[in-house]
Amino acid sequence: ILNYIKKIDPSLDLKVVELTSGVNANELLASGDVDANYFQHVPYLKDQEKALGKTFAVAATVHIEPLGIYSHKHKDFSSLPENATVAVPNNTTNLSRALFLLQAQKLIKLDPKFTDPATTLATPKDIVENPKHLKILEIESPQIPRSLDDVDLAVINGN
């Protein structure tokens, strides 16, 4: 998106730096190594502000990367066994988004106070119903696709 904008208006002094996994763009921003970043939704930004002890300005909101539920073992949710293991991202905001996605598929139910994934952050402790007794396994996001053979379901971030 940013490279497209740069092509439309070459007068912009915009240097786009693509980061590899494991690099925290907010740490780069906090240290002054970059002037801005473009990748996160507001709940994640707020979580990062707390973690880094910094306050960042929001110039504009961005799209939210989709999450998907994948499996090498099951073709549909009805074939999911009792005590199935579900890999989810271990970072606060994507973990919450994963739980909301599992709830949307009627695999779990969150405490009713969690109504909007854009404004509330749920954790596994907020699961109030888990009819199949799913085991929620929190894993580093980049490792989740590699875990597909070892888990029943994996919630994977689209980026």
Model-found features: residue ranges?
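Short beta-strand-centered segments that line the small-molecule binding cleft or hinge
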Residues: V34-N37, T55-T61
